[in-house]
Amino acid sequence: MERITVTLGERSYPITIAAGLFNEPASFLPLKSGDQVMLVTNETLAPLYLDKVRGVLERAGVNVDSVILPDGEQYKSLTVLDTVFTALLKKPHGRDTTLVALGGGVIGDLTGFAAASYQRGVRFIQVPTTLLSQVDSSVGGKTAVNHPLGKNMIGAFYQPASVVVDLDCLKTLPARELASGLAEVIKYGIILDADFFTWLEENLDALLRLDGPAMAYCIRRCCELKAEVVAADEREAGLRALLNLGHTFGHAIEAEMGYGNWLHGEAVAAGIVMAARASERLGQFSSADTQRIIALLERAGLPVNGPCEMSAQDYLPHMLRDKKVLAGELRLVLPLAIGKSEVRGGVSHEVVLSAIADCQQA
């Protein structure tokens, strides 16, 4: 069992990583006998894990209600969020309740925002079931729903009480979802840790076949890196923005193509290559390193070009709504070398459009 702490003073919390955690009531600390829980999951995951998690909590004396939501990025919306509020109010659940997010990034983000909002804030626990949510979205307290004009535009910074990563969940993960998660894994190596990037080049095949020790190390290292960044910059005033490598371009793809048509990691993968191309055009990143990135993403089964349905010009309206924009000026996360990156303002639209054009599907 691996345990990492996100250090945020009174709001510090553990990330527990191991196989078989759904069998252990102690995995779900700080829950205790007599506590009230609303377990939030989706239609795909409910048949796989709902009864198991409910059972282990009830054996510990926890009172469990549940709400099952539709599955997909397109349901990460205010309308579906209201479904959670209605379920909480009908019981009713008070300020002493705990929301448990059992799912991937959509469930985690939406449930976290529900917890931040319901009665001005209740406790919640992240139980991520996808690789993407285990290495990234469950850690750090970013919660949100989407708006038709932009991804994650309505939300709050709100930290969980704990994160429970059961590696056994990956056994039921579709190959496309596994690849999507690997985009965020690869991102960490590019922005923060050259040695980890090299390790990924050497061990990607083991990750693709869900080798237990390799996957445990991979998730632990990503969570360590994320925890360090969040502890230093919880509200994304500086360092934490580096975690958005590829996301300014990727969010544009998701919004333009319709949420769910491109998985988040797929859009981020294409966006990472666009960011690398932009950095190349600015003379601060080598084409050889871009090729290393492309090769690793392709081996993971990820796209390295944007959708053919989008022109370069289609990206800009979405990118200009990005949360990093200041005074109407684009600010991009750009790689400087493998393991090193920066947030840069003043990147011209010409450079951005050229980088996108370099990555358009034929």
From Swiss-Prot:
Zn(2+) binds at E184, H247, H264. Binds 1 divalent metal cation per subunit. Can use either Co(2+) or Zn(2+). One of its GO terms (cellular component) is cytoplasm. Signal peptide: none annotated. One of its GO terms (biological process) is amino acid biosynthetic process. Its EC number is 4.2.3.4. Pathway: Metabolic intermediate biosynthesis; chorismate biosynthesis; chorismate from D-erythrose 4-phosphate and phosphoenolpyruvate: step 2/7. This is 3-dehydroquinate synthase.
